Amino acid sequence: MTRPLVGVLALQGDVREHLAALNDSGADAVGIRRPEELEKIDGLVIPGGESTTMSKLLQIFELLEPLKARLRDGLPAYGSCAGMILLASEILDTRPDAQHLGAIDMTVRRNAFGRQVDSFESDLEFEGIVGDPMRAVFIRAPWVERVGDDVQILARVPESGGAAAGRIVAVRQGSVVATSFHPEVTGDRRVHELFVDIVRGV
């Protein structure tokens, strides 16, 4: 599999930016809006956006159950920000009727970093990614409060991060990766390259 076909859930969020990042990272990228399109892809990116709205859209577009089934069957997935929330097994501070995918054994606190005006940037050390620290952009972002035994912690907010210091902001469980930040907006392709490598290896 030289250039895997990776879908980007095209309901909300930075869809174009993720498509460009995946194409730059060695994948052929395509937007996903219909259940039948899930059958053709080798991996899926779930972009940022508003997680409760995205969960409603997944149901409206009849994608929720087919996507859960594909994830259970081992479809590699990467979620950023709201995508991380949707991939979690437990979500704090969300609507009681919000649906999620449960692909990573973790508890996520929605909007943990505060409102849009509280958005910030930080340099992170990211497990499995070499080179300079990764510049991470957090926009009304979640953080991870608990991970299961099979979940690998990839990045935390550094000690210089104030009240958020030490918070978990990137994880991996098997072939599923999630970050609370938005690598698609910085031009740093290393998270997308890591994910494309995971897709190739499955």
Curated annotation (Swiss-Prot):
PROSITE patterns assigned to the protein according to its UniProt record, in alphabetical order: PDXT_SNO_1, PDXT_SNO_2
UniProt KW Transferase keyword: no
Pfam families per the UniProt record, alphabetical: SNO
Top-level taxon of the source organism: Bacteria
Entry-linked InterPro entries: Class_I_gatase-like, PdxT/SNO, PdxT/SNO_CS
Function statement: Catalyzes the hydrolysis of glutamine to glutamate and ammonia as part of the biosynthesis of pyridoxal 5'-phosphate. The resulting ammonia molecule is channeled to the active site of PdxS.
Protein name from the UniProt record: Pyridoxal 5'-phosphate synthase subunit PdxT
Origin species: Rhodococcus opacus (strain B4)
Gene symbol of the encoding locus: pdxT
